[in-house]
Amino acid sequence: MKIDLNADLGEGCASDAELLTLVSSANIACGFHAGDAQTMQACVREAIKNGVAIGAHPSFPDRENFGRSAMQLPPETVYAQTLYQIGALATIARAQGGVMRHVKPHGMLYNQAAKEAQLADAIARAVYACDPALILVGLAGSELIRAGKQYGLTTREEVFADRGYQADGSLVPRSQPGALIENEEQALAQTLEMVQHGRVKSITGEWATVTAQTVCLHGDGEHALAFARRLRSTFAEKEIVVAA
């Protein structure tokens, strides 16, 4: 069995360099919620050094609230903003001899695109316009995954090690209790259940079906590095290969 392990980087966390030795894919902030040209260059350089797949992590224009503010923007605006961000990272990667491999939206852009078909379409269209060979990463079973497939893009369905799930397979909003899993044992058990058995127990006790092709590790968690190491060790014990 094989699984991709990804982390959001270039967001001002001190653990980026170490996380890049543990993950197989990096989602690099493109300036709209965090990061800038220099951090994008630095993350690309480290990703290349560690053989980690390079990905863009575009966001709504919301540095004030780290891309977590809900926005109702016209689809054409979202298309242009997404194309702008991923185009910048693709060029930075190419300038350093690397190749951008995937795109994963950030924060509220990701969450809204999971449920809003027009928004999902705008993102998928921007990814396709930039490079039809790019992989589009989205929440398992979401509108974003459906939109990507409609454009003929390769898609990758994502699950979260440290997020609570609702009965319909969507994430518990961060504003609600149960959104974040602080207990390492619980996060580890949830991850293995999703990867090995394709299901996750919701906060209300029901099982939701999920397709786990990539697991997100949040680099901003208090114990992110320790958990990442433990997850890698557990995957090795279960003969689960980590690869992009």
UniProtKB/Swiss-Prot annotation:
It is an enzyme of class 3 (hydrolase). Its EC number is 3.5.2.9. It holds the Pfam family LamB_YcsF. GO terms for biological process: carbohydrate metabolic process. Keywords: ATP-binding, Hydrolase, Nucleotide-binding. GO terms for molecular function: 5-oxoprolinase (ATP-hydrolyzing) activity; ATP binding. InterPro entries: Glyco_hydro/deAcase_b/a-brl, LamB/YcsF/PxpA-like. Gene3D superfamilies: Glycoside hydrolase/deacetylase (3.20.20.370). Belongs to the LamB/PxpA family. Forms a complex composed of PxpA, PxpB and PxpC. Catalyzes the cleavage of 5-oxoproline to form L-glutamate coupled to the hydrolysis of ATP to ADP and inorganic phosphate. NCBIfam families: PRK05406.1-1, PRK05406.1-3, PRK05406.1-4, PRK05406.1-5. This is 5-oxoprolinase subunit A. It comes from Escherichia coli (strain ATCC 8739 / DSM 1576 / NBRC 3972 / NCIMB 8545 / WDCM 00012 / Crooks).
